[in-house]
């Protein structure tokens, strides 16, 4: 079965839910630590997605600059 890749938006929603639950102060210390750990993992996924997008933009920008160079 193919693995479904998560979108930036879906990961961000999960992270927002974790933050909201931690803000409510209703979690035990153990659950707060688990939530924090999950939040860090989600942040790392978001950073990875953003870094990949940044690299794609750099490549596209560099290719675009080469394609549109006008010789004087």
Curated annotation (Swiss-Prot):
Q: InterPro entries in the record, alphabetically?
A: Exonuc_VII_S, Exonuc_VII_ssu_sf
For this record, the Gene Ontology CC terms, alphabetical, are: cytosol; exodeoxyribonuclease VII complex
Q: List the Gene Ontology MF annotations in alphabetical order.
A: exodeoxyribonuclease VII activity
User: What biological-process GO terms show up in the record?
Assistant: DNA catabolic process
Family that this chain belongs to: Belongs to the XseB family.
Query: Which Enzyme Commission numbers does its entry carry?
Result: 3.1.11.6
Q: Which HAMAP family match?
A: Exonuc_7_S
Which keywords belong to this entry? Cytoplasm, Exonuclease, Hydrolase, Nuclease
State the superkingdom. Bacteria
Q: How does it assemble?
A: Heterooligomer composed of large and small subunits.
NCBIfam families referenced in this protein's UniProt entry, alphabetically: PRK00977.1-4, xseB
Q: Which reaction does it catalyse?
A: Exonucleolytic cleavage in either 5'- to 3'- or 3'- to 5'-direction to yield nucleoside 5'-phosphates
Function description: Bidirectionally degrades single-stranded DNA into large acid-insoluble oligonucleotides, which are then degraded further into small acid-soluble oligonucleotides.
Query: Which residues are connected by disulfide bridges in this protein?
Result: none
Organism, as annotated: Clostridium kluyveri (strain ATCC 8527 / DSM 555 / NBRC 12016 / NCIMB 10680 / K1)
Where is the protein found, in the record's own terms? Answer: Cytoplasm
Q: What name does the UniProt record give this protein?
A: Exodeoxyribonuclease 7 small subunit
The answer to keyword Hydrolase applying to this record is: yes
A Pfam family it matches = Exonuc_VII_S
